Amino acid sequence: MAFLLSFLILAFLITIIFFLSSSSTKKVQENTTYGPPSYPLIGSILSFNKNRHRLLQWYTELLRLSPSQTILVPLLGNRRTIITTNPLNVEYILKTNFFNFPKGKPFTDLLGDLLGGGIFNVDGHSWSSQRKLASHEFSTRSLRSFAFEVLKDEVENRLVPVLSTAADVGTTVDLQDVLKRFAFDVVCKVSLGWDPDCLDLTRPVNPLVEAFDTAAEISARRATEPIYAVWKTKRVLNVGSERKLREAIRTVHVLVSEIVRAKKKSLEIGTGAEAKQDLLSRFLAAGHNGEAVRDMVISFIMAGRDTTSAAMTWLFWLLTENDDVERKILEEVDPLVSLGLGFEDLKEMAYTKACLCEAMRLYPPVSWDSKHAANDDVLPDGTRVKRGDKVTYFPYGMGRMETLWGTDSEEFNPNRWFDSEPGSTRPVLKPISPYKFPVFQAGPRVCVGKEMAFMQMKYVVGSVLSRFEIVPVNKDRPVFVPLLTAHMAGGLKVKIKRRSHILNNV
């Protein structure tokens, strides 16, 4: 089997080399002024492999050297990749010429096995129809109210008790794991009307959680393969990681389909008064069925389960390194929490929102996102794009560009989000272009759950910090790992201590 796999890969490479060698050298070398060293036939694969363990830092270093903040990374056997941190380019890709930069088949191939025809993995009519439905539902007061009640219940009756027990017993907890479990509970309740009860740490890991983790990780690693033929061949032969991925996806699809069938049955025999407010019930009521509705809810679970937990994990760690910032958050949230933190109170938490934005600027939940050019084009900075090129905007690198954020771009400074230093008067967040800070995408594909995500994060940060001190066990700087959603390598091991001030009310 191993010999056959090697032979097939070698045959594919020979084909690619022949194709490349027959192409015009002039065409290959357009736009190669900035980027890693590139050689005939093999492109930049030598530099890529050398820096594969530090791709984020490597791309950022290369982009800093480019006057246009755009680089070209040609790789053997793959499409040309254009990477940019230029906001003008980002706006052009995500808005101005949106229809020329769809996700494209190469992207949908990566995630198609898992996400199927869900909103985050399709283009054209399928995307627009799902987008219209999702935008309507996320804009309704009833869904926001339902989501807030789910959030409040999960925080007060599960998250806080888990942290209280850790504080009383003195055990070490992985805060990243706790927040991921919490987020999975919330997103499943809101999306499916189903409670996986992941924060019960005495129970085995839910099979759906385990399968989601495995499927997401292997799918993400497909994108980092320098030669796509490797994972595609493994998929055809059903061996190695691709076999493991197929099994995990089967588990996800089977379990979610069972939940969908049960929900549909309960709605059919129930009365109007018993109708649920979760997204699945709403999608079924709109006439969606079968694999279509399954793929839709899987996409929303995938989008919501790790993004907020990743952002909160990094913020909680950053606050342990910045006592003055933590103190300002407490000054903001303590008066609100003392009266019972409500939905309207979240609008008053401007400084907390600035801290969350600053954490996501430095450690974006999604490090990069790629589109594929439908036709030849020219970006605003003059970069020529060929049909089929992969065009990537790079939030991780954008957050570290001095040209965008100043000489302190690598420092954690929430005050940069205000027009002036927050003082005794209510601080006002200044408008920041979503094309400079595209962590929630921008343009027609801007995240429909953006405001709901901020609602969740602000409520959790306020509820946790007002009650507990978080003390990292390890003083080493955490390692940022980019997958489908970035996470902290090894988790965030902490001790939990109750706060000594008057709000210690649990």
UniProtKB/Swiss-Prot annotation:
Stored CDD domains: CYP86A
Gene Ontology CC annotations of this record: endoplasmic reticulum membrane
InterPro entries the record matches: Cyt_P450 (IPR001128), Cyt_P450_E_grp-I (IPR002401), Cyt_P450_sf (IPR036396)
UniProt catalytic activity: a jasmonyl-L-amino acid + reduced [NADPH--hemoprotein reductase] + O2 = a 12-hydroxyjasmonyl-L-alpha-amino acid + oxidized [NADPH--hemoprotein reductase] + H2O + H(+); L-isoleucine-(+)-7-isojasmonate + NADPH + O2 + H(+) = L-isoleucine-(+)-12-hydroxy-7-isojasmonate + NADP(+) + H2O; a jasmonyl-L-isoleucinate + NADPH + O2 + H(+) = L-isoleucine-12-hydroxyjasmonate + NADP(+) + H2O
Single GO biological process annotation from the record: jasmonic acid metabolic process
Residue stretches spanning the membrane: 2-22
Induction: Induced by wounding.
Record-linked SUPFAM superfamilies: Cytochrome P450
Observed effect of gene inactivation: No visible phenotype under normal growth conditions, but mutant plants accumulate high amounts of JA-Ile and have strongly reduced levels of 12-hydroxy-JA-Ile in response to wounding.
Cofactor(s) listed: heme
UniProt-listed Enzyme Commission number(s): 1.14.14.48
Topology in membrane: Single-pass membrane protein
Top-level EC class: oxidoreductase
Binding site for heme: C447
Top-rank lineage group of the source organism: Eukaryota
Assigned keywords, A-Z: Endoplasmic reticulum, Heme, Iron, Jasmonic acid signaling pathway, Membrane, Metal-binding, Monooxygenase, Oxidoreductase, Transmembrane, Transmembrane helix
Localization of this protein: Membrane; Endoplasmic reticulum membrane
Gene Ontology MF annotations: heme binding; iron ion binding; jasmonoyl-isoleucine-12-hydroxylase activity; oxidoreductase activity, acting on paired donors, with incorporation or reduction of molecular oxygen
Function: Hydroxylase involved in the oxidation of the plant hormone jasmonoyl-L-isoleucine (JA-Ile), a bioactive phytohormone of the jasmonate-mediated signaling pathway. Converts JA-Ile to 12-hydroxy-JA-Ile. Exerts negative feedback control on JA-Ile levels and plays a key role in attenuation of jasmonate responses. Negatively regulates the expression of wound-induced genes TIFY11A/JAZ5, TIFY5A/JAZ8 and TIFY5A/JAZ10. Catalyzes the hydroxylation of jasmonoyl-L-valine (JA-Val), jasmonoyl-L-leucine (JA-Leu) and jasmonoyl-L-phenylalanine (JA-Phe) in vitro.
Family: Belongs to the cytochrome P450 family.
Note: Plants over-expressing CAP94B3 are deficient in jasmonate perception.
Alphabetized PANTHER family for the sequence: CYTOCHROME P450
Protein name, UniProt field: Cytochrome P450 94B3
Species per Swiss-Prot/TrEMBL record: Arabidopsis thaliana (Mouse-ear cress)
Top-level taxonomy: Eukaryota, Viridiplantae, Streptophyta, Embryophyta, Tracheophyta
